[in-house]
Amino acid sequence: MAMSFSGAVLTGMASSFHSGAKQSSFGAVRVGQKTQFVVVSQRKKSLIYAAKGDGNILDDLNEATKKASDFVTDKTKEALADGEKAKDYVVEKNSETADTLGKEAEKAAAYVEEKGKEAANKAAEFAEGKAGEAKDATK
C-alpha cells in the first residue's frame, strides 16, 4: 500500500500507517490551527478519515473507548472484591478446621489413654492369674 502526502500532512503522523499487519489503532495529525485529521484503521487494511468535531467517528471512538475502559475497571474491582471474599472464606475455614482438628486430636488422645489403661488392667489381671496358677502348681 503506497501513499504520498505532503510534508505538512506527514508532520506528526509518525508510524500511523502499516502494511500487511493487522492493527487496531488510530493516529491524529494537526493540519491547521483548529482542524485535526484523524486516521483510524478499521478491519484489515481499510482506513477511515475524519475531521474532529461533532458527530464523527472520533467522538464515537472516544466514547466507546471510555465505555470499554469503565467496564474493565468495574469488572476488575468486582474481581478484586470477589478475591477478597474468597480469601476471607478460606482463612475462616482454615481456622475452623484447625479448631476441629484440635478437638478431634484431644478425643483421640483420651480414647487411646482409656484403651491403654484397659489393656494394662487386663495384662495385670492375666499376670496375677498366671502367678496364682504358678503358685498353686508349686505347692
Curated annotation (Swiss-Prot):
Transmembrane segments: none annotated. Remaining soluble upon boiling in aqueous solution. Oligomers can stay soluble with small structural change after boiling and freeze-thaw treatments. Predominantly unstructured in solution and mainly alpha-helical after drying. It is found in: Plastid, Chloroplast stroma. Belongs to the COR15 protein family. It comes from the Eukaryota. This is Protein COLD-REGULATED 15A, chloroplastic. One of its GO terms (molecular function) is lipid binding. Exhibits cryoprotective activity toward stromal substrates (e.g. LDH and rubisco) in chloroplasts and in protoplasts and confers freezing tolerance to plants in a CBF-dependent manner. Protectant against various stresses (e.g. cold, drought and heat stress) by preventing protein aggregation (e.g. LDH) and attenuating enzyme inactivation. Induction: Accumulates in leaves during cold acclimation (at protein level). Strongly induced by cold in association with a gradual irreversible decrease of H3K27me3 in the promoter region. Expressed transiently after moderate decrease in temperature (cooling) through the CBF signaling cascade, thus leading to an enhanced subsequent freezing resistance. Accumulates in response to high light, drought, high salt, polyethylene glycol (PEG) and abscisic acid (ABA). Cold-mediated induction is light-dependent and light-stimulated, and requires functional chloroplasts. Residues 1-40 form a transit peptide. GO terms for biological process: circadian rhythm; cold acclimation; drought recovery; heat acclimation; leaf senescence; plastid inner membrane organization; protein complex oligomerization; protein homooligomerization. Its main location: plastid. GO terms for cellular component: chloroplast; chloroplast envelope; chloroplast stroma; cytosol. Forms homooligomers which interact with potential stromal substrates in the stroma of chloroplasts. Interacts with the galactose headgroup of the chloroplast lipid monogalactosyldiacylglycerol (MGDG).
